[in-house]
């Protein structure tokens, strides 16, 4: 099993390498996309600087902690769109019967699909995330935790988006749900979790688990908690297994009719 996992990871990174090389054929566009994404992200921090000039704390966060929050959000989004870009187009691929080419490849279909393309601007998100970490204060501990949580956060958002996208095997318009979920995750991830109360906070730790992907990691970086750390790892593993299961379940339906004529 370990050999199979190793081979799948090797294939995934080879796919990433070739996708990036393909995008680098136009180096000016390649670099411009990355730089503009960094500048785009940085522009939002200006708004927070203005807010913190009026009030020292917002939701228990200082400006440095908000910058760290933005760093986690950006790097999470960056890794997800760099490695698993097609997970965010999964509904479109299923609805339009574009999985056929992946079915004949001698590797895991789900991984083949979601790693078949990359977003170059996501490199800018990833770089920006680590710039935020440097501004916050980089130490070996902070760097390791930040990297781990960027990966777990990326896997969580990719898995949940894939689950919603996989519903297109049964429901035609599930792409709307998947897009709404992705946008909600991104929007909530850039605000301190403590400003949300009661039912909204419950939703952010369950239905839209931005609390697990972003808020809990910030708390752990600020004040390490081993139980919370293990909880995030377990949640990430469970949601990943669920994403594979639902996609493979739906794939059997797709294999029987690639036109998906029997969907609702």
Question: Language-model features: where?
Answer:
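Hydrophobic transmembrane alpha-helices and immediately adjacent juxtamembrane helices
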Residues: 1-136, 140, 144-264
